[in-house]
Amino acid sequence: TTGSPQDARNAQDRAAAVGAVYLDGAIQVAPEQMGQPDTTILVSGAQAAFERGRGVLAVFGGNIVYLGDKPGAAATMDMATLSYVYGAVLGFVHGARVTEAEGLSLKAYGDIVAAMSPSYGQFLRHQAAVIDSGDFTVSQSPLSISVEATQRLERIARESGLDAQVPALAARLFRQAQDAGHGREELAALIKVLR
């Protein structure tokens, strides 16, 4: 497993104390997905060491992403991607409960989510650019739409007798963002209530 960013910094210090160079890494796939062209592995640490080891690392996966010389960068990005993954899993499993409650096909649900994921990935890339720029002017999706949608998800869960923890959390955060005046901004303005 990947350690924390501080664990990586400590490992670099220990390596340097004995004259070694340290690279930190974070595998972004399950074990059975290793060694594939699209297997993503995050790496950080000394660039010269990364360049020397690039060929060996490529055996483990085809998408080796070097994040710079900060030893904790790979662990930090791993925590960020895990935040996304676990949020997506919570949403997916809640959606499976909604699907079950209405007697619909879970296979169809999984197929729909898989088909829409590449487009949603592009949408999230746009949201990252919005946050990075600091310009939350609406260009794709105003936050207010998500306030209404998450409230509806929470209401439907309760009406169906489902556990409503996941949509309740989302509804609370989006409502908080709207109450703070961000409803007419890009969806990514939600980050302002998390800062």
Predicted region positions:
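Helical "substrate-binding/catalytic lid" subdomain
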Residues: A73-L169, L173-L194
